[in-house]
C-alpha cells in the first residue's frame, strides 16, 4: 500500500468514526447500542452518576444518584417495582451507603411506579403540585385495580417542599433541588450540583424525544428551559433519551427547546385555522420532529394539550 493510499484509508476511518459518534437519536438501535447493555451507569463526575434503563417502546428512562459521606441521593426512580429494585441493586455496586434522599423530579408513573421498593425511612423531596398528583393517583389506583389482582401501590411523600429551592448536604457534596417553573408537569423538580455544574432536569428535558405533553404547560415549559440554559451548567442530564457529553448536552437541550416551540406553534396554527383536534392531527406538519422518538404516539397528545391551553382548560 502506498503512503497516499494509507492516508486515504486512515482518513476514511476517522470520518466514519466521527459520523458514528455524531448520531443523535433516542433510539438505541440508531446509536448502535445493544439493549443488552442496559441498565447501565454513566459516571458524570466524582460521586455523581446517571442511570439509564430501557422502557417500552424501547428508549431510556434516566435516573440520577449522588453519593456523599452521609448517604446516597436518588432523583427519579424507574417505572416498576422490579426496575427500581434493579436500580437500587446497581447503586449498591457503586456505594453500600444507605439511600437516604429521593427527589421526585417527575410525578409520572414511569418514574415513580417503583417507589414501593425505596427504603421505608427515606426522605422525599417533592413539589406540592406533584405530591397532590400522587395523592390523586393513589386514590385512583386503590379503586381501579384489575379483578383478582392487588391495586397498584402509589407512594405518597408525607410532606412537600415549602419553597422553590432546597439545599441538601450529603457530606462532602451539596445538591440544590430546584423548581424552575411548570414544564412537563406542574411540579417538575431539578437537581443541581453547583460545584460539578451538572443539572439533572428529569422530564423537563427529553433528549431527541418528541415533546410529551400529557400533563404539560407548553408555553411555561420553554421558559423553564431558558432558565436552565442561563444557569452555570456544563452538563444537562435528561429524563428520557441518552445522557450526552457536556457540550452535546447543551446543544441537545437547545434542540429540544426548538422542538417544543415548533410543536406548540404548529398546534396553535392549526387551532387558528379552526380545525378540530382530529383534523389537526391529520394536517399537522411537524417538520424534522416527525422522526423523533414517540412522534407517532405523542403528536395527537400535544395538539390536545395546546388546544386545552388556548381554550382555557389549563390554569
Whereabouts are the PLM-identified features?
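Boundary at the C-terminal end of the N-terminal hydrophobic targeting segment
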Residues: 19-21
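Active-site neighborhood of phospho(di)ester-bond hydrolases with catalytic His/Asp-centered motifs
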Residues: 75-77, 100-108, 125-129, 180, ...
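Divalent-metal (often Zn2+) His-rich catalytic cores of metallo-beta-lactamase-fold enzymes
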Residues: 222-275, 279
